Each structure stands twice: as structure tokens, then as C-alpha cells.
């Protein structure tokens, strides 16, 4: 019995070309053919599937709201959690160094692998099969799309707050530390003419920027920190 059969059962798709699934599970640190190209494709396919569902289920929603709702469905945290739920982390092929540093628990690696699998299913069986698999993974989240309330991210709220007062837009200074496979992003957020300066630290630049923006809003003490999401945009 192929050791990937259990994973394919969880994914809801039996691959015709098993090599596609193997590549989708292979991180670049392993030194073999890796999943970066499949991830690139899967990112677009996944975004299209969710965007299409939102378009059908939320006919009254505006473009900006649709974009924010899609982002909440396909952000790194969401994809990493789904990757673990499907057991993808158990099958990842990593280099020795990446394994020792906890790569199978790393959010970005988990999210990238899920996107790569989406790309692999798309190549292996086409869009409709891929759509069926993706919507099945999301389960009740798909049914909730018609009720999903769009939240603006911290960067958008900060920009709107500043524009409403005719103030300069925020500046985000980024410092990157660590090895290429385990980078840490430190972002400082400030606005010319205002005394505040805040910092956000995370393993992705986008999330670090969101954290810094949220903290900046909280310093403004204008009620804008309530209900803000720091998710990637």
C-alpha cells in the first residue's frame, strides 16, 4: 500500500500522477525537485475558487469587501491550520536543517504545501475536481460565506484614519534577520508629524506590518483598535 494513500483519502483525490503529489510535499530545503512552482500555481487557483464562491454567494457585496473576505479565507494562518487538519505536515519532505528547526510546524511551510497541493490537483484532474476538493476542505466555512462579515485589516484602517484627517500615509521600515529558510521580519511603523512609532515582529512581512499598524492605531486612542484583524492582506 502506497504510504500516500491515507493522505489522498484525506484530500479527497486519488492522483493519477503520484509524482505531482510528491513534489507538492517537497520543500526547497530538501535539495530535490521542490514545490515552489506548484505553490505559485496553487495560490492563484485557490484564490480563484474562493473568489468565485464569494461572487456567487455574496451578490450584494462590494469589491473591497469581497477582497477582504477572500483574504480572510486564504491567509497564511488559515492555510497552515488547514494543512495540519488534513495531516499534510506528516508527509512533508524537508532538508535535515529544516527538520531540526521545526519546519513541519512552520506556518509558511505548511501554507505553501497546501497551495502546492491545490496546484497539483489542478494539473492532475482539472479545475472542477480541484474546486470540489477545496470546498470540501473548507467545509462549514463555505456555507458561512453568505454570512461572513468583512473586517478591514489594521493597515487599511490606519490609512483611512490618516486620510480622513489629511495626514501623511504611514511608513513601514522593514528589517530582516535570520537564515533564508527561517527569516524574522521586524517592521517599524511611523507617520511624519506624529510622535508615535510602533513595532511588529513576525515570520512574514505582511503580518509584521499588520501588527505594527494595529499597535499604532491603539496608540492613537481613538477607538480604532477594537475589532481589528492583524491577518495578512
Curated annotation (Swiss-Prot):
Gene3D superfamilies: 3.30.160.20, Ribonuclease III domain. It is found in: Cytoplasm. It is an enzyme of class 3 (hydrolase). GO terms for cellular component: cytoplasm. Residues 4-126 form the RNase III domain. SMART domains: DSRM (SM00358), RIBOc (SM00535). CDD domains: DSRM_RNAse_III_family, RIBOc. Disulfide bonds: none annotated. InterPro entries: dsRBD_dom, RNase_III, RNase_III_dom, RNase_III_sf. The active site is at 43, 115. Its cofactor is Mg(2+). Residues 153-222 form the DRBM domain. This is Ribonuclease 3. It comes from Coxiella burnetii (strain CbuK_Q154) (Coxiella burnetii (strain Q154)).
Amino acid at each position: 500500500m502506497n504510504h500516500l494513500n491515507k493522505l489522498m483519502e484525506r484530500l479527497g483525490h486519488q492522483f493519477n500522477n503520484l509524482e505531482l503529489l510528491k513534489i507538492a510535499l517537497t520543500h526547497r530545503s530538501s535539495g530535490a525537485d521542490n514545490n515552489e512552482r506548484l505553490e505559485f500555481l496553487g495560490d492563484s487557483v485557490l484564490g480563484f475558487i474562493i473568489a468565485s464562491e464569494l461572487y456567487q454567494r455574496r451578490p450584494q457585496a462590494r469589491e473591497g469587501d469581497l477582497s477582504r473576505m477572500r483574504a480572510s479565507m486564504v491567509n497564511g494562518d488559515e492555510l497552515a491550520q488547514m494543512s495540519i487538519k488534513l495531516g499534510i505536515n506528516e508527509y512533508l519532505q524537508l532538508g535535515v536543517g529544516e527538520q531540526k528547526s521545526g519546519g513541519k510546524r512552520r506556518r509558511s511551510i505548511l501554507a505553501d504545501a497546501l497551495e502546492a497541493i491545490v496546484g497539483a490537483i489542478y494539473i492532475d484532474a482539472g479545475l472542477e475536481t480541484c474546486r470540489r476538493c477545496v470546498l470540501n476542505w473548507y467545509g462549514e466555512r463555505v456555507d458561512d460565506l453568505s454570512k461572513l462579515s468583512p473586517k478591514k485589516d489594521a493597515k487599511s484602517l490606519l490609512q483611512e484614519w490618516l486620510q480622513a484627517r489629511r495626514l501623511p500615509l504611514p511608513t513601514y521600515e522593514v528589517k530582516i534577520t535570520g537564515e533564508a529558510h527561517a527569516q524574522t521580519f521586524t517592521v517599524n511603523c511611523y507617520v511624519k508629524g506624529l510622535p508615535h512609532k510602533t513595532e511588529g515582529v513576525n515570520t512574514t512581512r505582511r503580518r509584521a506590518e499588520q501588527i505594527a499598524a494595529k499597535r499604532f492605531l491603539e496608540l492613537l486612542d481613538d477607538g480604532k483598535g477594537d475589532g481589528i484583524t492583524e491577518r495578512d492582506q
